[in-house]
């Protein structure tokens, strides 16, 4: 962890390669040390779809100009871009839909799905729930790490920037472990293997709503820092949060990763936090509060069995992800949905689904009260995945299902097969 922590805020109005290259060059100059050996660039490519999700991932060209700059350093022996995208979706498909493979070809840098490559099991000294991790080879062997998040609001973790980016450092095999009411601790657990040397944040266009199908908001900013905690401290303030209110950021500080006092971070550049926060102050990020959604579906959130807290990162997160995807693909689906109720966790109180169905999502879900509903159905899983729910929620509430998309379903199947072939080729089992 650097003693002198800084964050550079530069106005960048568009994804102009020349301007982005200037800012990236300035960031390396401020860092004061050159990348050496094996360099890994990790962007956010959680999900992409050419028809309805083009604002959830780091701009490929920003990653490309960063790769060009890295190659200028004589001590760099190897350079690769790596990522593990959304669970149950082949990352290679998101690479294609976002343009990352094309960018890699233009800039001559390989783009790798961590799930298709080798890994090794490592012990964690600071982990609370993850005591070991299956660490991707490219992360474990990297001599210099550059994390390149996309600044977004997050449906259950307030913000996603440098720290939350590390969920994409996990293989899908371990992605859903502790992805429940322990998610914020999980994020900090992974920081032990995914501590970057430099953070370059794409905030030219930021995202709000469901982060995997984010709605765009033009902020006109590139943010660079020599410390992931400092980067998140500033990112939190830009999005209107006090740093201590971002739970994974507070937990990271408590575990010794550095102060989250804004005064401990030197802010440089040509635009201030206050001006940027003023720009974002009017954003209402849908799906953070389910009670504010414009829909006839009623939501009842109970506590999880592990911590006695709302299970924010478990089944309700999957519900948010499923509904967010459905509504992004077919806008208005939520507003026009049939009435009913969705319950997650252990809910103390009565549930009223009216004349519609009541879905109990997850193994632990129970209602300690009365249920008024036409039908009651349990959907098993702990936590359940958003993809699984795409076969349940649309039929229950009369919404169009992504499972019947004539374009996307064959792509998922074909790229899943290719993923398995690549895993065999690289002995990634």
Regions found by a protein language model. Name each.
Residues 1-429:
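N-terminal and secondary-structure boundary signal
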């Amino acid at each position: 962890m650097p003693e002198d922590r800084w964050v550079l805020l530069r106005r960048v109005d568009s994804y102009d390669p020349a301007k982005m290259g200037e800012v990236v060059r300035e960031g390396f100059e401020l860092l004061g040390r050159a990348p050496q050996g094996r360099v890994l660039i990790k962007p956010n490519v959680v999900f992409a779809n050419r028809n309805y999700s083009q604002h959830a991932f780091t701009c490929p060209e920003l990653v490309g100009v960063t790769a060009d700059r890295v190659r200028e350093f004589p001590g760099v022996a190897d350079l690769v871009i790596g990522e593990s995208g959304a669970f149950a979706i082949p990352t290679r498909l998101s690479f294609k839909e976002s343009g990352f493979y094309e960018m890699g070809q233009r800039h001559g840098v390989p783009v790798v799905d961590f799930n298709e490559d080798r890994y090794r099991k490592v012990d964690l000294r600071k982990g609370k729930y993850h005591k070991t991790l299956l660490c991707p080879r490219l992360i474990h062997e990297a001599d210099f790490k550059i994390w390149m998040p996309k600044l977004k609001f997050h449906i259950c973790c307030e913000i996603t920037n440098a720290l939350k980016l590390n969920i994409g450092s996990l293989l899908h095999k371990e992605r859903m472990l502790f992805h429940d009411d322990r998610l914020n601790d999980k994020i900090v657990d992974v920081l032990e293997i995914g501590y970057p040397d430099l953070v370059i944040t794409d905030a030219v266009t930021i995202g709000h709503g469901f982060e995997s199908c984010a709605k765009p908001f033009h902020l006109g900013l590139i943010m660079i820092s020599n410390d992931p905690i400092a980067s998140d401290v500033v990112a939190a303030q830009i999005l209107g949060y006090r740093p201590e209110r971002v739970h994974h950021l507070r937990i990271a500080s408590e575990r010794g990763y550095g102060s989250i006092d804004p005064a401990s971070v030197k802010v440089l550049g040509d635009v201030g936090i206050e001006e940027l926060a003023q720009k974002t102050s009017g954003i209402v990020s849908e799906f953070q509060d389910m009670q504010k959604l414009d829909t006839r579906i009623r939501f009842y959130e109970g506590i999880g069995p592990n911590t006695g807290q709302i299970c924010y990162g478990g089944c309700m997160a999957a519900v948010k992800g499923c509904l967010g995807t459905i509504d992004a693909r077919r806008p208005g689906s939520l507003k026009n949905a049939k009435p009913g109720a969705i319950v997650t966790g252990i809910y103390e109180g009565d549930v009223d689904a009216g004349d519609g169905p009541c879905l109990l999502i997850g193994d632990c879900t129970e209602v300690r009260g009365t249920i008024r509903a036409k039908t009651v159905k349990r959907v098993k899983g702990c936590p359940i995945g958003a993809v699984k729910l795409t076969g349940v929620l649309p039929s229950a509430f009369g919404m169009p299902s992504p499972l019947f998309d004539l374009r996307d379903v064959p792509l998922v199947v074909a790229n899943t097969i290719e993923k398995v072939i690549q895993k065999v080729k690289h002995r990634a089992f």
